[in-house]
């Protein structure tokens, strides 16, 4: 029996049916599955501006497949627009709001399945958390990647504009050049074009089996994206008939596959946070140490921005995520028996994919000639992060640095210092009180890291924070430091000039201060009043867990 029978069957449900008749149901429709279409459409960001078209295609395909689609909206926050402002504190919060809204709408109306459509960074994990919680048949449709901007012969992304700010501040480019980059960086609809957070999470979801093969790298404005959205609705109707539910697919092995693909494509640090949160909602025992274990055996084989040369449409043209997965599967680095929402195993899905990438491209490297021999997202531990932290070590020349701490209590203070040439080669920049509780909201530090790169300090300065990093960040950056400063973590005890060692080879992050002195500082530490005590941010700060657990708000 369909779950929606709770609102469509029996004489007692006559009032319920009366309401449904008002929105277009006829007598025969009460026997059809009701599908929710969670539409993240918004004109605030290019990531989501094209979602209405995909929603309409999905809606029509669902009707043709014998279902009754019911569309409802969910929110988005544009990370690129809110970046570097107080508004960025709402970004990670929006992941929880999206998850809660989808769960609420679907369960309140007893929907039989849900097709979630999203574009910007938090849309993907928010939808996946909801699907995992509800465990009703579901499919995710990614809005698609933006195509690269062009300036002369150079491919641009929005990160090019962030880096140009640092280049302008250091005198490397003039205002006219800065404006030219600004005007050409984002040419149309779609999510930020490199292997940044949105494209990383779409790749992870395709690997997990809750979106269709090849769909995670399609360009937003191409017809194949709209066709894929329509096909996704058909697949969802079949999944309802076959009772294929998210938790059937979201196994520990599936998460290990997703982590392997994130490493192989050189994905965002945010994947650690989001996959931990999705796994928790699915009841899967995934921990931060699993990422390090997998990193040690999976190389980076895609040469993608931010640290590489190419963008996601180039990856799609080179064979997409299936081509990446086929190499990993053949090498024994993936679990081939994991299934997708179509009910097919990974091994079945990849049987016709070439074992080696085409020699006519160099976006996807063969395993024998990787971009990096090991994964790029290292989990460091030490007295500065006893619960762990995430270091992105791709594109850096020196994975070991010991230097003096430059301590900042906010992103804004740090950015001002960088742009005023007060951060020098060899410094270890510490931005604290930006964690899940302390921020609150764990802002991304793209503006400071881009300014560092723009001033040609990317391989000479390290940055440590209890906040996050954008998927567009590269260099020696260490985020998600836990415990965070606001709850008494060691990062809150660092003083200006203290010696800090980051050693990616030894997986170590250490504050080089005598134990007695650290104990003295700890005893003198006092918890500060929350920056927000009411509203969404106040509520979030009271509820959110540590970054090492995914920064979730529904912990038991």
Swiss-Prot record:
It catalyses: (2R)-2,3-dihydroxy-3-methylbutanoate = 3-methyl-2-oxobutanoate + H2O; (2R,3R)-2,3-dihydroxy-3-methylpentanoate = (S)-3-methyl-2-oxopentanoate + H2O. [2Fe-2S] cluster binds at residues 47, 120, 192. GO terms for molecular function: 2 iron, 2 sulfur cluster binding; dihydroxy-acid dehydratase activity; magnesium ion binding. The keyword Iron applies. Keywords: 2Fe-2S, Amino-acid biosynthesis, Branched-chain amino acid biosynthesis, Iron, Iron-sulfur, Lyase, Magnesium, Metal-binding. It is an enzyme of class 4 (lyase). Its cofactor is [2Fe-2S] cluster; Mg(2+). This is Dihydroxy-acid dehydratase. It comes from Prochlorococcus marinus (strain MIT 9313). Its EC number is 4.2.1.9. Binds 1 [2Fe-2S] cluster per subunit. This cluster acts as a Lewis acid cofactor. Belongs to the IlvD/Edd family.
């Amino acid at each position: 029996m369909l779950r929606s029978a709770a609102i469509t069957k029996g004489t007692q449900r006559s009032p319920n049916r009366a309401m449904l008749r008002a929105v277009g149901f006829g007598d025969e429709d009460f026997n059809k599955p009701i599908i929710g279409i969670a539409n993240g459409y918004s004109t605030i960001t290019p990531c989501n501006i094209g979602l209405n078209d995909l929603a309409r295609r999905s809606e029509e395909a669902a009707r043709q497949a014998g279902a009754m689609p019911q569309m409802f909206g969910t929110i988005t926050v544009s990370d690129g627009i809110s970046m570097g402002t107080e508004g960025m504190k709402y970004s990670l919060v929006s992941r929880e709001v999206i998850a809660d809204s989808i769960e609420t709408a679907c369960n309140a109306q007893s929907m039989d399945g849900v097709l979630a459509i999203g574009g910007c960074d938090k849309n993907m994990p928010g939808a996946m958390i909801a699907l995992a919680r509800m465990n009703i048949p579901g499919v995710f449709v990614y809005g698609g990647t933006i195509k690269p901007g062009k300036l002369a012969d150079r491919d641009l992304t929005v990160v090019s504009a962030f880096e140009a700010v640092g280049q302008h501040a250091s005198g490397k480019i003039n205002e006219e050049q800065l404006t030219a980059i600004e005007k050409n960086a984002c040419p149309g609809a779609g999510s930020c074009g490199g292997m940044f957070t949105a494209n990383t999470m779409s790749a992870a979801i395709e690997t997990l089996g809750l979106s269709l093969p090849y769909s995670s790298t399609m360009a937003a404005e191409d017809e194949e994206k709209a066709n894929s959205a329509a096909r996704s609705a058909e697949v969802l109707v079949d999944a309802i008939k076959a009772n294929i539910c998210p938790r059937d697919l979201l196994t520990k092995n599936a998460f290990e596959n997703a982590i392997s693909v994130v490493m192989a494509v050189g994905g965002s640090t945010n994947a650690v946070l989001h996959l931990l949160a999705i796994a928790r909602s699915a009841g899967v025992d995934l921990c931060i140490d699993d990422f390090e274990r997998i990193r040690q055996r999976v190389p980076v084989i895609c040469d993608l921005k931010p640290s590489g040369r190419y963008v996601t449409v180039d990856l799609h043209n080179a064979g997409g995520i299936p081509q990446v997965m086929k190499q990993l599967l053949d090498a024994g680095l993936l679990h081939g028996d994991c299934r997708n929402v179509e009910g097919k195993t990974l091994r079945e899905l990849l049987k016709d994919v070439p074992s080696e990438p085409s020699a006519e491209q160099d976006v996807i490297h063969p395993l024998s000639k990787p971009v990096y021999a090991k994964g790029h997202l290292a989990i460091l531990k030490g007295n500065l992060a006893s619960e762990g932290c995430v270091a992105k070590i791709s594109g850096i020349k020196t994975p070991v640095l010991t230097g003096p701490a430059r301590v900042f209590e906010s992103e804004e203070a740090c950015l001002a210092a960088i742009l005023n040439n007060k951060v020098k080669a060899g410094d270890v920049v510490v931005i604290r009180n930006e964690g899940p509780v302390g921020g609150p909201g764990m802002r991304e530090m793209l503006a400071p890291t881009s300014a560092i790169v723009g001033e040609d300090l990317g391989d000479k300065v390290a940055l440590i924070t209890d906040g996050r990093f954008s998927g567009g960040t590269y260099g020696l950056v260490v985020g998600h430091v836990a415990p965070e400063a606001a709850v008494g973590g060691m990062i809150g005890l660092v003083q200006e000039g203290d010696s800090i060692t980051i050693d990616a080879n030894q997986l170590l992050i250490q504050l080089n201060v005598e134990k007695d002195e650290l104990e003295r500082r700890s005893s003198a530490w006092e918890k500060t009043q929350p920056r927000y005590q009411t509203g969404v941010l106040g509520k979030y700060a009271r509820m959110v867990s540590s970054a090492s657990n995914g920064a979730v708000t529904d912990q038991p």
